[in-house]
Amino acid sequence: MLGTDIENTNTEYPTETTVFQLAAITPENHKYWDGYKSDGQTYIDPNGVGYYLSKSSTRSAKYEKNFPQVTVGERSTKPTSGDWVSLTLQHGKAPRGASYEYAVLPRTDAVSLKAFAKKPSYKVLQQDRNAHIVRSLTDNLTSYVLFETPQTLPADGLLQKADTSCLVMIREDRANCY
């Protein structure tokens, strides 16, 4: 997941990106999160979903465990409570040009997640206000999110031209090139 050019003029409240927010409803979930420790770059939830933060995103990460969180809602003056954990990326008040990078790995375990963190299997080719382009190093896939009509694209990519904003995913197959 990539985010680019995050900005606003709100100086009263901080801006954040939520990576995950999970309710701890069962006793098993409580026990899991009570004993949970992260290295600050990788997180794994009790469902086996792993989260990897790039080095630049770890600086703004905020992990919170709220057992319980008591809130008074907008529609009722009666307090409600619940137990939850969250991971957010903090961009500050009135951010200008903030960005983030993280990966979500479903059906993983702690060992596989740590291995991924040591050697991520993707490469960000472009991350700016015009495009997010990411290449998977394991399966020859390149994903393009073009926000604007691109002026330039990576020279070594199969997508050489686009006349509008679009989403494109291309798998290179050198064995079947014509």
Predicted regions and their residues:
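A structural signal for short secondary-structure junctions
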Residues: 10-13, 79-81, 93-97, 171-174
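Secondary-structure transition/turn motif
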Residues: 5-7, 67, 135-141
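Trp/Gly-enriched beta-strand surface patches
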Residues: 33-88, 154
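Generic recognition of flexible, low-complexity loop/linker segments
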Residues: 3, 85-93, 120-122, 164-168
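Short conserved micro-motifs at the rims of enzyme active sites and ligand-binding pockets
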Residues: 30, 63-65, 113-115
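Non-catalytic terminal regions with compositionally biased, polar/charged low complexity
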Residues: 105-178
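Short Pro-Gly-centered flexible turn/kink motifs
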Residues: 95-106
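Catalytic and substrate-binding regions of extracellular carbohydrate-active enzymes
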Residues: 1-33
